[in-house]
Amino acid sequence: MDSVILSARGLTRHFGGLRAVDGVDFDLRTGEIHALIGPNGAGKTTFVSLLSGRVPVQSGSITLGAEDITALPAHARVRKGIAYTFQITSVYPRLSVYDNVALAVPPEAGELRPAVMAALSRVGLADRADQIAGTLSYGHQRLLELGMGLALRPRVLILDEPTQGLASGEVAGFAALVRSLVPETTVLLIEHNMELVMDLAQRITVLNFGQVLATGTPAEIRANRAVQAAYLGGDDAAA
């Protein structure tokens, strides 16, 4: 049986009468690419915000490895090895590409410059280290954001709609990059591009109305009648 690096049990977060996340059980296996999909309002972003500590848990528990991290704030979870790249690009536009990544490098990484350049090389931006981040194309800003995440040397990398706004050619390059991260890094992918999800993920979890509708391989999810009903046959239901 594959080991589990990140798990949630009974994870719940309500906002007034809205059951954004409602008793979710979830397992992320070490070294996998696991996609999280669901219709608009299904609870995807709230769920990963609970995992990363950006939103406090109302009830339930979160475990990283063998450690209960439910009560830890976001910055402490980063130190434990969870990196979360945001749905909207979050680079520092007035700083250089190099300085953006340098801010993310943990003290224990050793010498700063080799760590920064290694992360930039990984995402193909080493030759743009001195460029001001705000002058990068949108696609390159998304790559920079990923480089910042990799500089943290995460055990788990959460990618929230990483291909949003990318050209088709950039999406293909991004997919190749994500594949190169595993099994060293475990990836949780929230993505609206269903073709990419089916091609990239080893397993998929479908959320609907804040609850898990199904979990399985791409083939199992594609054949699941409950998933088909939730999506009403639409191609864009994971947005």
Where would I find each of the regions flagged by the language model?
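Glycine-rich phosphate-binding loops of nucleotide-dependent enzymes
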Residues: 2-239
